[in-house]
Amino acid sequence: SRLGVQVVATGRNPVLAKIADPEVAKAAQTYFAHQMPMALGCRDVLAERRGDMVRFEAGALKADVQYVLVTQGRSPRLADLALDQAGVRFDAQGRPLWDRASLRCLDSRVFLAGDATGERPLMHEAAQEGTIAAQQALRAVGDARWQDLPVRGRSVPLSIVFSAPDVAEVGLRFSELPPEAVVVTARGAGNGRSKIMQAPEHVLRLYADPASRQLLGASLLCAGGEHLAHLLAWAIQRADTVEQLLALPSYH
């Protein structure tokens, strides 16, 4: 839409980009709604060819468009693999029972990684899970070269939508926070650089544990937010405290 092309958008989820933090979700929806008409939470969408155009209807949103871009999730296709013959057990929904740390299906020598888990369908997560699963599998078959090596654990969750501004969530999501967690908010309206960039709608939310004073997670809508999210993920994985973070170099 910023290139002069009229764009309309819809999604089945009522929350844009599945943002868990309500303040960040509200800021993102308000901002991007000014960029293009949107209809969220629409389960039924009509896309019907009419001559050289496509009639598009989603809730109250109706438009005749030239092109339709569809993005959809990935569902693991495990039903035809007969994993039960390898000792894999399943839950009531037909999903394998597996250990999140080792990626091993319970009571079996089958390991899941990447999209097969259906849990973190992100490229960097899939790459890391492939390494973990391979190392655990070699241990399981008794490969002596892997027995004494440190076990690689899962990294802190890091999810980024590469938009302008970026949307990112790091560590614990807002819905996963313990009741005692402290939540602090920084907004673009209070930052000189954001004012110059004319970005008052930018927002950063940080979550911390008051007892350990460690950072638990973050959610943000910021220009260049991917870099800030990456640094915050490092800080959370290192179990940095608020004081340690404040002592680090920073700029405006």
Over which residues does each language-model region extend?
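Cofactor-binding loop segments of dinucleotide-utilizing enzymes, especially the Rossmann-like FAD-
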Residues: 12, 115, 220
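Glycine/Thr-rich phosphate-binding loops of Rossmann-like dinucleotide-binding domains
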Residues: 17, 77-80, 120, 194, ...
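Short acidic-glycine loop/turn motifs at beta-strand connectors
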Residues: 50-51, 85, 92, 210-212
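Flexible, glycine-rich terminal cap/loop adjacent to redox cofactors
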Residues: 162-252
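Rossmann-like dinucleotide-binding cores of NAD(P)H-dependent redox enzymes
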Residues: 1-51, 55, 121-127, 142-175
